[in-house]
Curated annotation (Swiss-Prot):
Record protein name field: Tyrosine--tRNA ligase
Gene3D superfamilies listed in its UniProt record: HUPs, RNA-binding S4 domain, Tyrosyl-Transfer RNA Synthetase
Motif stretch ('KMSKS' region): 241-245
PANTHER family recorded: TYROSINE--TRNA LIGASE, MITOCHONDRIAL, TYROSYL-TRNA SYNTHETASE
Pfam families according to UniProt: SYY_C-terminal, tRNA-synt_1b
Cell compartment(s), UniProt: Cytoplasm
Primary role: Catalyzes the attachment of tyrosine to tRNA(Tyr) in a two-step reaction: tyrosine is first activated by ATP to form Tyr-AMP and then transferred to the acceptor end of tRNA(Tyr).
Subcellular location, principal: cytoplasm
GO molecular function, one term: ATP binding
Class of this enzyme: ligase
Any one of the GO BP annotations: tyrosyl-tRNA aminoacylation
Record organism: Bifidobacterium longum (strain DJO10A)
Motif interval(s): 'HIGH' region: 51-60
Length: 440
């Protein structure tokens, strides 16, 4: 299983010291006040997740990891699934969000709760509490909202928020709906403070303006100084944000991104990212991370850091069994141990997805082969050879494999049993060139 340790086991004196070392804090309220809150008696904290898609992604995973660190230290988590704010959407850096139907948002909210519940403890003294801001927002009239909440917000301060200011200066501008989002989020913090004495909110660094709205509101109407902190935004090698709206999301839901592909995402990260990713996305002790980083520098070909990272994050999100299945599938694919026949159909399809070809309609599909078709024809269809004669030469030299079994006969045909899960036949040329055909 993934290593999940509290700050003392990880080699740190305080929780804040660990979070800072791991690069999990970008901005915060007064550091001494935050440190005192985290190091004292258990507090209640919250993080909001808007159901603007059917799954969370790795940008949200950073927040869940922060929540887990605090939970392990004995603090009490609240996961707010934004049944109300999810109907509106927080302002993006550019472009208005699409407003989704209420029933769709409600369905997504249920899925997000299940994902969060698979990562945070849902039982015990400090089990995660789930709330929806729809419960206290939906019944509020416009008059109540403007009188009781809106009057506490100054327009100048709201207009100065980074995202709002940027959108105001853009061609598309910003709607009143998205402009009001920060007021709703501020009211959420106030409600949770009143209801559960919640004194800390977590979020991504792009949420800083929304987080401070609640901070200022509580100070103004309750006279109490609470805390917020943000984590950095995760970017890819080109500096672009990993997220739903960027089109390259790494989803946490196994039905939207298989555990195999999730595992492959992490194991294929470059050496230069190992230190930051091991710190941020694993709970490994400081000494072990330092050892792995040094190993990646002195013996990069071993890829121990990448393998450890992929195991830790995938098992944290999807569990040990799914992670081991992903590893076994990868090994079986290239004939390095494990049996192709043992891979379930869903994992198999995910593993082979990269071997689709573009058909005459521009669609990515598996090339079709039927029982009785020659292996050399299937290999050509899979894009491994340009001609039958080229395929025959490769077979003669012992370099063609069907489901990891070497082909000896140039005229061998596919049998019903050659289609794994009744659907796929895997053909390999040499050690690394792979292709797949589908019986359909």
């Amino acid at each position: 299983m993934a290593h999940v340790t509290d700050f003392k086991e990880a080699g740190f004196n305080t929780l804040l010291e660990e979070l800072e070392w791991r690069g999990l804090i970008s901005q915060s309220t007064d550091r001494d006040r935050l440190a005192e809150a985290l190091n004292g008696e258990p507090i209640t904290y919250y993080c909001g997740f808007d159901p603007t898609a059917a799954s969370l992604h790795i940008g949200n995973l950073v927040q869940l990891i922060n929540m887990r660190h605090l939970q392990l230290a004995g603090h009490h988590p609240i996961a707010l699934v934004g049944g109300a704010t999810g109907l509106i959407g927080d302002p993006r850096q550019s472009g208005e969000r699409t407003l989704n139907p209420k029933d769709v948002v409600a369905g997504w909210a249920d899925r997000l709760k299940n994902q969060i519940g698979g990562i945070l403890d849902t039982e015990g003294a400090n089990a995660v509490r789930f709330v929806s801001n729809y419960d206290w927002t939906a019944s509020m009239t416009v008059i109540d909202f403007l009188r009781d909440v809106g009057k506490n917000f100054r327009l100048g301060t709201m207009l100065a928020k980074d995202t709002v200011a940027r959108r105001l200066n853009s061609e598309e501008g910003i709607s009143f709906t998205e402009f009001s989002y920060q007021v709703l989020q501020g009211n959420d913090f106030l409600h949770l403070f009143d209801e559960y004495h919640c004194t800390l909110e977590l979020g991504g660094s792009d949420q800083w303006g929304n987080l401070t709205s609640g901070l200022d509101l509580i100070h103004k109407v309750r006279g109490v100084d609470v805390n917020v902190f943000t984590s950095p935004i995760i970017t890819d090698a080109s500096g672009k944000k990993f997220g739903k709206s960027e089109g390259n999301a790494v989803w946490l839901d196994a039905t939207m991104l298989s555990p195999y592909k999730f595992y492959q995402f992490w194991i294929n990260r470059p050496d230069v990212e190992m230190e930051s990713l091991l710190k941020a996305f694993t709970f490994l002790p400081k000494a072990e991370i330092e050892r792995l980083v040094e190993e990646s520098k002195t013996n990069p070909g071993k890829r121990e850091a990448q393998k450890t990272l992929a195991w830790e994050v995938t098992s944290f999100v999807h569990g040990e069994a799914a992670t081991q299945a992903a590893i076994d599938a990868s090994g079986a694919l290239f004939g390095r141990g494990g049996n192709l026949e043992d891979i379930d159909e869903e994992t198999l399809e995910s593993v082979l997805d990269g071997f689709k070809v573009v058909d005459e309609n521009g669609e990515h599909v598996f090339p079709v082969s039927k029982p009785g078709d020659r292996v050399i024809d299937a290999a050509q269809a899979a894009g491994l050879f340009k001609s039958a004669s080229e395929a025959r030469r490769a077979i003669k030299s012992g370099g063609v494999y069907l489901n990891n079994n070497r082909i000896e006969d140039e005229e061998q045909v596919l049998a019903e049993a050659d289609f794994l899960a009744g659907r796929f036949a895997l053909i390999r040329r040499g050690k690394k060139a792979l292709g797949a055909v589908e019986n359909r």
